[in-house]
Amino acid sequence: MQRMIEISSPFFLNPDELSTPADWAAVFGNANPLALEIGCGIGDFIARTAADNPGTNYIAIDFYNKGCDKTCRRLERLAIPNVRVVRDEARKFIVERIPKGSLCAVHINCPDPWPKMRHRKRRLVNREFAAFIREYLAPGGDFYFATDFDDYGIDVAEFMPGVEGYANMLAPDRYRHELEGYHLSKYMMKFMAEGKRIYFVHYRKTAEGAA
């Protein structure tokens, strides 16, 4: 069981104190486009990405309290104003707090690959999840997935063309091992230093996929 750390940071949100769905313009104090990172880790990816895109508001969600705390500390240290951090289970949070058709981007970087065959049904990103998250993307919204696990990367790259309402932004490739302009997290760089390859998948919601 994870040790719960009390997080007292202006960047940290208690999901139970948000409306259903949340009024994100009120939370951020502006109506800028809204993006979501699922699994923020220690916050290095979201900090760099948000700093590069000050006109976008970012929600960084993680189930682990320690990661949320480290992310908040990083944001405070770097004074990055356009991120809010939430500790919650991803799908539950999305259903309860994110308005459908509101996200300009979703980032999922190196989620648990559940490598054992009998556990793979526990993977976050599968065909059903891709269809689910599409409902929360705005038309033209981007879906980014990255993993260091070969089987996971190939699996996502293989099923995504069959999910309706998306366009492959890497076509004719189904995945790439480099994605220009996409920040690498500490974990990605660690995996690459070990000789592993990162699989990047990038799709965009089409107008036909509008909710």
From Swiss-Prot:
Query: What are the GO cellular component annotations?
Result: tRNA methyltransferase complex
**Residues of the active site:** 112
Binding residue positions for substrate: 116, 148
Question: Can you tell me which residues the record assigns to a coiled coil?
Answer: none
Recorded superkingdom: Bacteria
Tell me the enzyme class: transferase
Q: What is its EC number?
A: 2.1.1.33
Q: Which GO molecular function annotations are given, in alphabetical order?
A: tRNA (guanine(46)-N7)-methyltransferase activity
Q: What is this protein called?
A: tRNA (guanine-N(7)-)-methyltransferase
